[in-house]
């Protein structure tokens, strides 16, 4: 399966996960990466929160261009949404990171990897408010 098809499949998986939760709905922005205008992969909400989510998936480390993060910030601010990066690595559940918790690459770009999402990310259930995980210092 091509990485583009896999990414689209996982975006749809996350889309359906939100719809299965009572009170949550959303939409997938088709072709979000092919426009010059800021557009996240998913926009979801529950009447009190709106999330703009850029999805990343794969086997290991994923690099994220500074421009993509900047566009997510712009969109979220204009739309009144919280900006999040959703990450689904092979054999791992979805994890979500706030933009300030992304890893910094050389230059001005960012990255996510499995170690980073486990240490700095939150799981789907925490994102939607089912529980709040306490972290040990």
Regions found by a protein language model. Give the residues of each.
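Active-site metal-binding core of divalent-cation-utilizing nuclease and nuclease-like domains
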Residues: 25-47
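Amphipathic alpha-helical interface surfaces
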Residues: 14, 38, 68-72
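Domain-level recognition of nuclease-like catalytic cores that cleave nucleotide substrates
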Residues: 5-9, 82, 88-137
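Conserved catalytic cores of phosphodiester-cleaving nucleases, focusing on short active-site segments
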Residues: 42-44, 48-59
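Arginine/glycine-rich "motif VI" loop of SF2 helicases in the C-terminal RecA-like domain
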Residues: 74-81
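Acidic-basic catalytic patches of nuclease active cores, encompassing PD-(D/E)XK
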Residues: 1-31
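Active-site-adjacent loop/helix micro-motif of nuclease/hydrolase catalytic cores
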Residues: 59-70
């Amino acid at each position: 399966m091509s990485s583009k098809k896999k990414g689209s499949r996982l975006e749809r998986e996350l889309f359906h996960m939100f719809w299965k939760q009572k009170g949550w709905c959303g939409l997938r922005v088709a072709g979000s990466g092919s426009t010059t205008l800021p557009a996240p992969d998913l926009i979801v909400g529950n009447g009190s929160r709106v999330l703009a989510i850029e999805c990343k998936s794969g086997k290991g480390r994923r690099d994220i261009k500074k421009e993509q993060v900047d566009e997510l910030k712009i969109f979220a601010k204009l739309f009144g949404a919280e900006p999040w990066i959703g990450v689904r690595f092979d054999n791992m559940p979805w994890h979500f990171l706030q933009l300030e918790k992304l890893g910094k690459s050389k230059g001005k770009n960012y990255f996510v990897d499995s170690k980073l999402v486990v240490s700095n990310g939150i799981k789907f259930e925490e994102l939607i408010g089912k529980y709040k995980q306490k972290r040990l210092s």
